[in-house]
UniProtKB/Swiss-Prot annotation:
This is Interleukin-33. Cytokine that binds to and signals through the IL1RL1/ST2 receptor which in turn activates NF-kappa-B and MAPK signaling pathways in target cells. Involved in the maturation of Th2 cells inducing the secretion of T-helper type 2-associated cytokines. Also involved in activation of mast cells, basophils, eosinophils and natural killer cells. Acts as a chemoattractant for Th2 cells, and may function as an 'alarmin', that amplifies immune responses during tissue injury. In quiescent endothelia the uncleaved form is constitutively and abundantly expressed, and acts as a chromatin-associated nuclear factor with transcriptional repressor properties, it may sequester nuclear NF-kappaB/RELA, lowering expression of its targets. This form is rapidely lost upon angiogenic or pro-inflammatory activation. The gene is Il33. Coiled coil: none annotated. The full-length protein can be released from cells and is able to signal via the IL1RL1/ST2 receptor. However, proteolytic processing by CELA1, CSTG/cathepsin G and ELANE/neutrophil elastase produces C-terminal peptides that are more active than the unprocessed full-length protein. May also be proteolytically processed by calpains. Proteolytic cleavage mediated by apoptotic caspases including CASP3 and CASP7 results in IL33 inactivation. Forms a 1:1:1 heterotrimeric complex with its primary high-affinity receptor IL1RL1 and the coreceptor IL1RAP. Interacts with cargo receptor TMED10; the interaction mediates the translocation from the cytoplasm into the ERGIC (endoplasmic reticulum-Golgi intermediate compartment) and thereby secretion. One of its GO terms (biological process) is antibacterial innate immune response. It comes from Rattus norvegicus. Residues 66-108 are annotated as: Interaction with RELA. Belongs to the IL-1 family. Highly divergent.
Length: 264
């Protein structure tokens, strides 16, 4: 008769098994939120128009910096790179923002929003300074010589996309650019083309500039541009007797309608 063998059904915990080899299980080291440093990451997208203007778009988000962690075995510290990638939803949002920015170049003129606003010094072909000066409560237009070391006054220019097709590469997406001009401190006052006496004057507006306050921008050379009246095709802002006036383009008055814009 064979003796009966007894088997134990008791379970040994994994920690006890591992202790037989001189090692104990330790929970993994986790990096707390306080250790996860964040940094501001910005992407800048620039679109350069054929007219030489550059439209700038900046998109920013927060990413995680690499954090220092300690090794369980050696106790030494080393850098581990935390994820700096955006979630898919954030990536889609960022991509959509870029696409909307690119598409906005075609739709801004429909919405009546300026593509770009900047302050520039406006000079004639003969390097005379054009300025809008407030005198006795009214703005006047001055065209005067300026010394070499004298700082030129600036005017405010807003750029728009027009409905006129570009023929000489001075537009964007086949359309010419338009501008209107204002004093720096009074943006509701616009330079207007008066078709009755062929003069140029500053007038206060209500909500949006009228057609006579828009001028189609033509790039004459790398340094000079001209301003054609939107409401009077073939008529430009020009200089007559040291004053701004409306001038029809011809060979004799070509230099009189050329102006230089400089940001200084």
């Amino acid at each position: 008769m064979r003796p009966r063998m007894k088997y134990s059904n008791s379970k040994i915990s994994p920690a006890k098994c591992d202790s037989t080899s001189g090692r104990a299980l330790v929970p993994p080291c986790k990096i707390t939120r306080s250790q996860q440093k964040t940094k501001d990451i910005c992407h800048v997208y620039c679109m350069r128009l054929r007219s030489g203007l550059t439209i700038r778009k900046e998109t920013c988000y927060f990413g995680k910096e690499p954090a220092k962690r300690y090794s369980l075995k050696s106790g030494s510290k080393h850098e581990g790179r935390l994820s700096t990638c955006l979630p898919d939803s954030r990536k889609r949002s960022l991509l959509g923002s870029i696409q909307a920015f690119a598409a906005s170049v075609d739709t801004l003129s429909i919405q009546g929003t300026s593509l770009l606003t900047e302050s520039c010094a406006l000079s004639t072909y003969n390097d005379q300074s054009v300025s809008f000066v407030l005198e006795n409560g009214c703005y006047v237009i001055n065209v005067e010589d300026c010394g070499k070391n004298q700082e030129k006054d600036k005017v405010l220019l807003r750029y728009y996309e027009s409905s006129f097709p570009a023929q000489s590469g001075d537009g964007v997406d086949g359309k010419k650019l338009m501008v209107n001009m204002s004093p720096i401190k009074d943006t509701d006052i616009w330079l207007n083309a008066n078709d009755k006496d062929y003069s140029v004057e500053l007038q206060k507006g209500d909500v949006s500039p009228p057609d006579q306050a828009f001028f189609v921008l033509h790039k004459k050379s790398s340094d000079f541009v001209s301003f054609e009246c939107k409401n009077l095709p073939g008529t430009y802002i020009g200089v007559k007797d040291n004053q701004l006036a409306l001038v029809e383009e011809n060979d004799e008055s070509c230099n009189n309608i050329m102006f230089k814009l400089s940001k200084m």
